[in-house]
Amino acid sequence: MDRTLLIMPESGLQFDWQAIAANPYGKHEPSLSLVSYKALYTNRIAQARAQGLEPVLVSLPIMDENRYFAHITRGMTMQERKNVLYWLGGKTERLRNIHALYNLALFRLAAVQCIHIVDITSPMLSSTFYDELLSEDGITLSPAGEALVDAELGKIKAHEAA
């Protein structure tokens, strides 16, 4: 059976950061809620199976919450940055935690659906220089990060050929 990789770069960190900066006391939702994220993947898995394909999930890459915070607040005033940080509970780690929730959802979905997941998170975290695997924005893969992901995906192809 042919395999298809299901990859979605969205990790729940797409918020209206300007709105948060303007009103850090308000309720703000990501552009793709965790419930919608899981439903979207569940639908894609069903579509792949309906086409006779074996779906394979790919975990989310790591992220650097401090670099990402600097990225999402660039161009903001000091007060707006403080407002965003306040909304995050005073810690940029909340960004990493939100990202991790979406990543864990992928692993749970793979288990429930009995499908394979390519874990790119672990080798990235295991890297001594994991910060070099990310671009300046703290969430986009650098060329080195892309090479690591390609190597992990290559392991699947090598396993299939064996």
PLM feature spans:
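Alpha-helical cap/lid subdomain in secreted, periplasmic
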Residues: 1-143, 147, 151-162
